[in-house]
């Protein structure tokens, strides 16, 4: 789509009453020019234009342009500070940039605004584990597991955190639970859990009886 056509599309959308749909969904496709045209179109203001920044930020995040994504999410949060998904999206960009403290703070904010979804707890657990805070990571994973008990990846990641703490029995229980969940689109997760179980079995010391004196 040409840069001339994009603004024309936005104007046409306004004319036929599709402006809100265009703004809210401009990030669904890899067309950042549409989001940029929405941002530059003066009738859009306030929380509505935040969707355009959010959409362009998500496009940048999908393509690994984390700094661009963070800049757009900053603008979106400034315009719509009570939208939990914006903090979660920015947290993902921070985490991928290695800014774990900022990522954890944003996951905390996303959870404070909307504590029901499991994913922010899971992703916060990943950031905490990467930072070495295994106790808090396990707590965060545990909430994710409670909210989404069929999420095999959350159980695998909690098992890995238990394993890193030397809690082999707890780790084994999570790996076994991940494998036992109903089949879905998580074959790689199950394979990883099986591999970890095999490692644990191989690492178990052979029980040798010592004769009593």
Tell me the role of every PLM-derived stretch:
Residues 55, 89, 123, 157, ...:
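Canonical tetratricopeptide repeat
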Residues 54, 61, 88, 94-95, ...:
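Position-specific recognition of the canonical hydrophobic site in helix A of tetratricopeptide repeat
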Residues 46, 50, 84-85, 118-119, ...:
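Helix-start (N-cap) detector for alpha-helical repeat units in TPR-like alpha-solenoids
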């Amino acid at each position: 789509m040409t840069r001339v056509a994009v603004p024309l599309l936005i104007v046409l959308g306004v004319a036929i009453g599709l402006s809100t749909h265009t703004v809210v969904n401009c990030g669904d496709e890899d067309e950042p020019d549409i989001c940029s045209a929405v941002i530059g179109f003066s009738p859009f203001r306030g929380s509505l234009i935040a969707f355009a920044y959010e959409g362009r930020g998500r496009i940048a995040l999908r393509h690994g342009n984390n700094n661009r994504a963070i800049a757009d999410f900053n603008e979106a949060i400034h315009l719509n500070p009570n939208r939990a998904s914006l903090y979660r999206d920015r947290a993902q960009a921070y985490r991928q940039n290695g800014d774990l403290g900022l990522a954890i703070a944003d996951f905390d904010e996303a959870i404070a605004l909307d504590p029901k979804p499991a994913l922010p707890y899971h992703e916060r657990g990943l950031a905490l584990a990467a930072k070495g805070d295994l106790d808090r990571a396990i707590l965060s994973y545990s909430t994710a597991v409670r909210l989404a008990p069929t999420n095999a990846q959350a159980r695998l990641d909690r098992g890995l955190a238990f394993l890193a703490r030397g809690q082999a029995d707890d780790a084994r229980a999570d790996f076994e639970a991940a494998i036992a969940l109903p089949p879905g689109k998580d074959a790689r997760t199950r394979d990883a859990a099986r591999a970890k179980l095999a490692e644990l079995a191989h690492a178990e010391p052979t029980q040798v009886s010592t004769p009593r004196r």
